[in-house]
A protein has these predicted regions:
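A glycine- and Lys/Arg-enriched "phosphate-lid" helix/loop adjacent to the NTP-binding pocket
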Residues: 92-138
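Conserved nucleotide-binding/hydrolysis micro-motifs of P-loop NTPases
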Residues: 26-29, 76-77, 99-105, 157-158
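Conserved beta-strand scaffold positions in the cores of enzyme catalytic domains, especially
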Residues: 19-21, 91-96, 150-152
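NTP-dependent small-molecule kinase module
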Residues: 137-163
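Walker A/P-loop
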Residues: 7
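Glycine-rich phosphate-binding loop used to anchor ATP phosphates in small-molecule kinases
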Residues: 46-99
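ATP-binding Walker
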Residues: 3-4
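Conserved substrate/cofactor phosphate-moiety recognition/catalytic segment
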Residues: 11-54
Length: 163
């Protein structure tokens, strides 16, 4: 979900492990700004369909080349596992960051405050408590339905992933 700290976490993992990361948002904006797609930043579901085949093959290439790569972003389908054979899956760790309703309601000001911790968000007006609640509810349902690893942010923001 948006505003959960994915990019900050990827940056911390880069600094700790020296693994490069791919921000799917950067790929998205490059394709939109270059005119290679008519999709806009508001076309979330369509962007997932459009971006995922590219990202998926980048992941496969990194694994084939025995290279570490952190991929972060919202545009990964919950059924991503179906697109990889076992030899790839053995080399992939997936985590879905989701904030609880309680956390969002108690910390919304901080969520907005830290939105620019690693990236500059030019237009963040769409980010309301309601939109963050809705998006995190959607992501939690999707993650549970597909039985993926969830990093559930509930009482405090403590996200630490061991690679």
């Amino acid at each position: 979900a948006s505003h959960t700290g994915k990019t900050v976490l990827a940056q911390k993992l880069l600094e700790k492990h020296k693994y490069p990361y791919l921000s799917i948002d950067h790929l998205k904006m490059g394709l939109i700004r270059s005119g290679y797609t008519k999709l806009t930043v508001k076309d979330d579901d369509k962007l997932t369909e459009y971006l995922w085949p590219i990202v998926r093959e980048m992941i496969k290439t990194a694994i084939e080349n025995r290279q570490n790569l952190i991929v972060e972003g919202c545009y990964i389908p919950f059924d991503w596992v179906n697109d990889f054979e076992k030899e790839y899956l053995d080399n992939i760790k997936y985590y879905c960051l989701v904030m609880s309703k309680k956390y969002i309601e108690n910390n919304f000001d901080n969520i907005k405050k830290y939105a620019n911790a690693v990236e500059s968000r030019i237009d963040d007006e769409w980010c309301t408590m309601e939109s963050v609640l809705d998006e995190n509810t959607k992501f939690l349902k999707g993650a549970k339905k597909h039985n993926v690893n969830i990093v559930f942010i509930d009482d405090s923001y403590k996200v630490d992933i061991d690679l």
